[in-house]
Amino acid sequence: MKTLTPSVEIFFFPYVGGGHQIPMIDAARMFASHGASSTILATPSTTPLFQKCITRDQKFGLPISIHTLSADVPQSDISVGPFLDTSALLEPLRQLLLQRRPHCIVVDMFHRWSGDVVYELGIPRTLFNGIGCFALCVQENLRHVAFKSVSTDSEPFLVPNIPDRIEMTMSQLPPFLRNPSGIPERWRGMKQLEEKSFGTLINSFYDLEPAYADLIKSKWGNKAWIVGPVSFCNRSKEDKTERGKPPTIDEQNCLNWLNSKKPSSVLYASFGSLARLPPEQLKEIAYGLEASEQSFIWVVGNILHNPSENKENGSGNWLPEGFEQRMKETGKGLVLRGWAPQLLILEHAAIKGFMTHCGWNSTLEGVSAGVPMITWPLTAEQFSNEKLITEVLKTGVQVGNREWWPWNAEWKGLVGREKVEVAVRKLMVESVEADEMRRRAKDIAGKAARAVEEGGTSYADVEALIQELQARTCANQG
């Protein structure tokens, strides 16, 4: 690739958590591939996590770099997720913006304190929201609903003012939607950040949720650029393996195991980087997977232990006795602990289905790989994503969880092994319904790939934002 001459300078300021950090790094790389000078604002702790892929991009001539802010956020604090206070980065950010004055800064929604300093310096600020058009529309239309007609948390209600007939329950909603009058200050801060922004970058693509993309673009007071799936910037095996952080599993062992399986024969199960399932839920998943008699690869991340228990993932009684040995002997299953190269796994020819927590990154990665899903939402906007997958796109089946899980709270809503087995069989065993889900999933995957190519809708939106920033620069200079 020849060296690109930068057209505009854009700063990308990701949040420290993996689920928010990874897609914004991908977005920065995507904009760099369009000729925008992209600078990623990182901390001493986060810079090493993506230094290798940025160095590779630089060798290919892309105008991309990392600026490490002088302050840091302690890694031990990242476990509190979206509630982590990152305002220690405010002064280093202010000094950098005074020195460099980029044409635009893309800010993660969780840096809710950043709005004032960017606004004060007159730099256009674009919000990176991290969820899709459908979920944004659901949230916006539920934000001012009092739910007066609902008598219990389990009673269904119709989501108003959206193109599809979608029912939800109070138990599937985060607290700030259940009780809009009691919105915490942090959520109000994020809403204010959105309202004062120049526009919003959305990691999705038009053909995935066209009615909702149109709704956002026509009704939002600010501008929206739909630029995904940004994960397509990861072309090489190295990019996919090292995305986010180095895998903590034996990558080659994982790929060798998958290579030994027939095409379209394996279920991939993973619940993301932050979800912490308790041992009793892990056991039910294990029993359900075994009873389904389907081949699977299961990545177990963090475990929600009682305070008195050993907290090492490799210890404790969190799998049925003899389970892993039986899976090894029969060749039916592979259990992995820690961080796995999800893009590589999902794109492998052996993968037939994906059991997922419906985080937006995982949802888009499953969509892009053309893999139908078993949906197991836990928190955030994941129940809305489940509705998109199973009721709008019709490319998945629900496992049956009905309880929204408050962050770091006691686990609720245990899903039994029978429901796990039924969902796995429904997705993995050949049937007219399963075949139709796979056909739709493959069709959508093709549209995802075309969206980021020249002539695609996401490609056009990236170009449109760059051109708008160029026009603003010319107007200011004139």
From Swiss-Prot:
Sorted UniProt keywords: Glycosyltransferase, Transferase
Enzyme Commission no: 2.4.1.263
Q: What is stated about pH in the biophysicochemical properties?
A: Optimum pH is 6.0-7.3.
Enumerate the CDD domains for this protein.
Answer: GT1_Gtf-like
Q: Where does an anthocyanidin bind?
A: 20, 380
Q: Which InterPro entries match?
A: UDP_glucos_trans, UDP_glycos_trans_CS
PROSITE patterns the UniProt entry points to: UDPGT (PS00375)
Please name the PANTHER family in this protein's record: GLYCOSYLTRANSFERASE (PTHR48047:SF81)
Name the record gives this protein: Abscisate beta-glucosyltransferase
